[in-house]
Amino acid sequence: MGLNDQEWQQVLTMWGKVESDLAGHGHAVLMRLFKSHPETMDRFDKFRGLKTPDEMRGSEDMKKHGVTVLTLGQILKKKGHHEAELKPLSQTHATKHKVPVKYLEFISEAIMKVIAQKHASNFGADAQEAMKKALELFRNDMASKYKEFGFQG
């Protein structure tokens, strides 16, 4: 399941493009997530009042949270050695927000689609496969941590 050095390099090169506009990418990821899986919006009290795509596009709270979501880059930069970063994240997601692992899959899909849309020429099959593996590693490790906190997610 682990990634080799070349795969990690592909992931981090792509993530550098994401970080060049973290707010824009993060907002696009949340927009795609909520459009594809509207049930996920129930986990976000501050977004429940947003009913239309225009309201979502204009939401400053949603833009800010998009940046927060994409701090995932800090975990990716650890190349799988992310125990210290993952523990507090998994604890809040398991015990406070109660985010099911399935929702982590949904947001991973949204991340992949947004990167593919915004960076099609740089996100070929190899880079996509590497990113998919990195996000899967993240999700699997989150799921393991969830169990440590007694959340089956």
Swiss-Prot record:
Pfam families in the record, alphabetically? Globin
* Binding sites annotated in the UniProt record for nitrite: H65
Give all cystine bridges in this chain.
Answer: none
From the Swiss-Prot or TrEMBL record, state where the protein is found: Cytoplasm, Sarcoplasm
Gene Ontology MF annotations: heme binding; metal ion binding; nitrite reductase activity; oxygen binding; oxygen carrier activity; peroxidase activity
Q: Where does O2 bind?
A: H65
Residues forming the Globin domain are 2-147
> What are the EC numbers?
1.7.-.-, 1.11.1.-
Q: Which reaction does it catalyse?
A: Fe(III)-heme b-[protein] + nitric oxide + H2O = Fe(II)-heme b-[protein] + nitrite + 2 H(+); H2O2 + AH2 = A + 2 H2O
List the GO biological process terms.
Answer: removal of superoxide radicals
Binding annotation for heme b? H93
InterPro entries from the UniProt entry: Globin (IPR000971), Globin-like_sf (IPR009050), Myoglobin (IPR002335)
> What highest taxon heads this organism's lineage?
Eukaryota
What keywords is this UniProt entry annotated with? Cytoplasm, Heme, Iron, Metal-binding, Muscle protein, Oxidoreductase, Oxygen transport, Transport
Q: Name one GO cellular component term.
A: extracellular exosome
What the record says about family reads: Belongs to the globin family.
Q: What does this protein do?
A: Monomeric heme protein which primary function is to store oxygen and facilitate its diffusion within muscle tissues. Reversibly binds oxygen through a pentacoordinated heme iron and enables its timely and efficient release as needed during periods of heightened demand. Depending on the oxidative conditions of tissues and cells, and in addition to its ability to bind oxygen, it also has a nitrite reductase activity whereby it regulates the production of bioactive nitric oxide.
Quaternary structure per UniProt?
A: Monomeric.
What PANTHER family does the record tag this protein with? MYOGLOBIN (PTHR47132:SF1)
Mind telling me what this protein is named? Myoglobin
The root-end lineage is: Eukaryota, Metazoa, Chordata, Craniata, Vertebrata
Instruction: Provide the gene name from the record.
Output: MB
